[in-house]
């Protein structure tokens, strides 16, 4: 907690206090390029939200993520519970396991409704939407990468095995790295850090601690390549990871949102 008598906060809290950085002094041409790059990154992340909402995860991975082997090998998807490391690992969990879940839900839905199984009904009873807000995007000084943070108050509705529905509210801090491939920014690393989540119908004065085995988001994240405590939501948004992006010269593993940039793994320990 902050000691309000001295206005002194512990170091971990100070690390994530928002800071203002004035725009750099640039030529007109460089300023136009920087603003164009920022809007390109914002558009990419907005499109990703709509692809997710429409269950177009394979399309997202094919169109919006890195594809060059040097980048694909170190692409990552992180959450509170660890990282999927390497694009093939992201594919395995984010696309393949998700599609298997949707097919199982389709079978349940059709059995409960007494209708023939039809893939046109894939996703019936399910909904996922995480709109993005309050973006901060930094373009590297070398122009070859970008970093961004967004906040999302999202919701997820799923069909359970017994045919009943479950609903979830999610409060998320989303951070990502982007690199240029063929002159276009592509998603390289993403961390979806959950600050809070509540099952629909939960009383707002109820105990907010969720045992990991009962945490729908932890269960859904499966078995990541690197299991670890990436973001401790005991402190909600004030946890110092993932930090807000600051101005930087060039993207390195150590300053990235990939596992190599996490304070516990900095320098490649365990990666």
Regions found by a protein language model. Give the residues of each.
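Short, surface-exposed coil-to-beta transition loops
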Residues: 130-132, 168-174
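A solvent-exposed, acidic/Ser-Thr-rich amphipathic alpha-helical stretch
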Residues: 58-154
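Active-site rim elements
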Residues: 34, 124, 162-166
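Short, low-complexity N-terminal intrinsically disordered segments enriched in polar/charged residues
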Residues: 1-59, 63-67
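Short beta-strand segments enriched in hydrophobic/aromatic residues
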Residues: 52, 65, 152-154, 191-194
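Short beta-strand edge/turn micro-motifs at domain boundaries
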Residues: 2-19, 145-149, 171-202
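Low-complexity, intrinsically disordered terminal/linker segments enriched in charged
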Residues: 160-170, 181, 191-271
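Short acidic, glycine/proline-rich loop/turn micro-motifs
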Residues: 74-76, 158-163
């Amino acid at each position: 907690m902050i000691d309000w008598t001295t206005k002194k906060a512990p170091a971990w809290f100070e690390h994530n206090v928002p800071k203002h950085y004035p725009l750099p002094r640039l030529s007109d041409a460089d300023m136009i390029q920087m603003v164009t790059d920022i809007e390109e990154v914002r558009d990419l992340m907005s499109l990703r939200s709509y692809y997710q909402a429409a269950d177009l995860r394979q399309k997202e991975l094919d169109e919006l993520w890195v594809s060059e082997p040097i980048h694909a090998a170190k692409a990552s998807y992180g959450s509170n519970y660890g990282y999927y490391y390497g694009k093939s690992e992201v594919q395995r969990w984010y696309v393949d396991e998700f599609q298997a879940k949707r097919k199982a839900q389709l079978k349940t839905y059709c059995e409960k409704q007494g209708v023939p199984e039809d893939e046109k009904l894939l996703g019936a009873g399910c909904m996922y939407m995480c709109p993005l807000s309050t973006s901060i995007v930094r373009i590297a000084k070398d122009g070859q990468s970008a970093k961004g943070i967004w906040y999302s108050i999202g919701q997820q509705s799923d069909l359970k095995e017994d045919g009943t529905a479950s609903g979830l509210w999610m409060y998320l801090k989303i951070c990502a790295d982007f690199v240029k491939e063929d002159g276009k920014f592509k998603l390289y690393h993403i961390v979806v850090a959950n600050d809070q989540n509540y099952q629909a119908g939960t009383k707002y004065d109820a105990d907010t601690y969720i045992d990991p085995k009962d945490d729908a988001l932890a269960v859904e994240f499966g078995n990541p390549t690197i299991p670890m405590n990436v973001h401790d939501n005991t402190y909600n948004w004030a946890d110092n990871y993932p930090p807000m992006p600051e101005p930087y010269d060039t993207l390195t593993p150590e300053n990235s949102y990939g596992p190599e940039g996490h304070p516990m793994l900095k320098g490649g320990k365990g990666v």
